[in-house]
C-alpha cells in the first residue's frame, strides 16, 4: 500500500489548503487497518510524513519514487495500490479515478474492479479506469499496480469530503473491498 507524496513533497494543495500527502496517509492507514483485521499482511511504503530514499542524494522526488518502487519490488506483494488525490484547473471536475499501466492486463482488470468498488462512495461518478504509460510507479513495479485518485482537491465540495474523517472511512471501506475483489478474483 503506497501513500503518495510525503515530507517535503506535499503533493496537491486543495482549495481548502489540505495537503494531498496528509489525506493520502490518513486513507492508507484506514485501509491497512481494515485489511489487517481480515488477516492480510500489508506492507506500507510509508507510515509517517516523510519522503523516502536518501535525502542527501540530490533530487529528492526521483529518489522517493525509486525507493517506493524498490519497496514494492523487494516485497513482491500480490498487488500494489497507490493512494493519491487529483487536481485540475477547472474546479467543477470531480470523481475518483483509477489508473493502470497500459501494458498490464492484470493492472487493467484490477483498475476496473477498483473503479467499480468506488461507486459505493459516489454512484454519480462516471469516471472510468484509465490506462497510462508514463507514471513511473506503474511502469517500474514488477507486480500489478494501480493508482487510486480518490477525488479532486481542486473541487471545493470534494476537497471538504476528502478531509472529513467519516468520508475517509467510507473511501477506505470501498478501496479495501476493491483490493479484496482484485486479489481474490
Descriptions of predicted regions:
Residues 30, 34, 117, 178:
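Rossmann-fold NAD(P)-dependent oxidoreductase module
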Residues 39, 95, 125-126, 142:
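A generic structural signal for alpha->beta connector loops
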Residues 107-131:
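Active-site-adjacent substrate-binding region
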Residues 5-112:
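Catalytic-core regions of hydrolytic enzymes
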Residues 75, 89, 126-185:
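Active-site-adjacent mobile loop/cap segments within catalytic or ligand-binding domains
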Amino acid at each position: 500500500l503506497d501513500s503518495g507524496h510525503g515530507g517535503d513533497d506535499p503533493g496537491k494543495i486543495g482549495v481548502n489548503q489540505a495537503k494531498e500527502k496528509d489525506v493520502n496517509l490518513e486513507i492508507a492507514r484506514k485501509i491497512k487497518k481494515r485489511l489487517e483485521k481480515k488477516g492480510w499482511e500489508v506492507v506500507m511504503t510509508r507510515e509517517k510524513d516523510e519522503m523516502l530514499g536518501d535525502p542527501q542524494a540530490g533530487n529528492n522526488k526521483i529518489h522517493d519514487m525509486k525507493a517506493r518502487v524498490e519497496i514494492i519490488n523487494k516485497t513482491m506483494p500480490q498487488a500494489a495500490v497507490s493512494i493519491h488525490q487529483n487536481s485540475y484547473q477547472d474546479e467543477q471536475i470531480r470523481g475518483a479515478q483509477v489508473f493502470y499501466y497500459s501494458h498490464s492486463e492484470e493492472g487493467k482488470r484490477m483498475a476496473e474492479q477498483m473503479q467499480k468498488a468506488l461507486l459505493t462512495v459516489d454512484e454519480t461518478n462516471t469516471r472510468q479506469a484509465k490506462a497510462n504509460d508514463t507514471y513511473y510507479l506503474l511502469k517500474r513495479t514488477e507486480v500489478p499496480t494501480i493508482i487510486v485518485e480518490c477525488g479532486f482537491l481542486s473541487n471545493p465540495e470534494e476537497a471538504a469530503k476528502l478531509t472529513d474523517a467519516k468520508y475517509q472511512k467510507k473511501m477506505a471501506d470501498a478501496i479495501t473491498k476493491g483490493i479484496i475483489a482484485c486479489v481474490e478474483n
